[in-house]
Amino acid sequence: YQSDAKPAGVIDFGAQDDKTKAYSPQNDYYYIPEKNFVVPAGTEAGGAQFNHPLKDGKFDENPAKVTGNNVFSEKPSIDDWYETMKLNYGYDLQNGKNYLDPVPPVWTKMRDILVFWANKGVDGFRCDVAEFVPVEFWHWVIPEVRKINSNMVFIAEAYDPSKYANYVSYGGFNYMYDKVGLYDALKPLIKNEANATVATMRKVIQSQEGGLSNHMLRFLENHDEERLASKGFAQKPEFAKAAMVLT
């Protein structure tokens, strides 16, 4: 990673990493030492109709980095997040150890990025797959950003309901995605599937009692899911009016 727009004095991610080590508490990335990254078979950059001299199925990354979805191999599959890189928030994932004191270098780099945008007037952040980032980091960084704006809103995209309460109470998030919960309970009802039941919806609502419900961001559409009026969902938006009352 090499930024062409970073403020003076800012160090790029990975610029000071020891790439001979698979893991170091001081590294920003996780590495596959002495292995070159291999572009997954079937990759069709730009689509089949796109042609370019640089479209040769190769990408120079040596040593290969671990992917954002934790693939510790230089040969991720086409279904892996091979175009992303796992950031080191202080956890040695392969050996089950953590190094959180002193604060890992990635923590301060990410804080500086968030503060940069907060100082420009951004008043909220939607954090992609926030549960892949240790809750200890959020507990530390969210108050740091709120020094700029005490009303800063943090929304977590997360898919593990068992983590919701902790990411709100300890992590400091304002809202958690209610996808694996109310959305997944409502969709079968809207589609009138044979096994759809209000009992599933009731179970979700009861599991969010005790104040958690106020921190759930509910929806019937987002960029990852089917459009409401699509053939695979409600077919007609009118069929989802009742569900909209709950979301």
Spans of features found by a protein language model:
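The substrate-binding groove and active-site-proximal loops of carbohydrate-active enzymes
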Residues: 83-106, 123-132, 185-192, 224-235
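Substrate-binding/active-site clefts of carbohydrate-active enzymes
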Residues: 1-109, 113-116, 164-165
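Generic, ordered loop/turn and secondary-structure boundary motif
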Residues: 51, 82, 88-90, 117, ...
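Active-site-proximal helices and loops of the catalytic beta/alpha 8
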Residues: 2-27, 31-35, 39, 112-115, ...
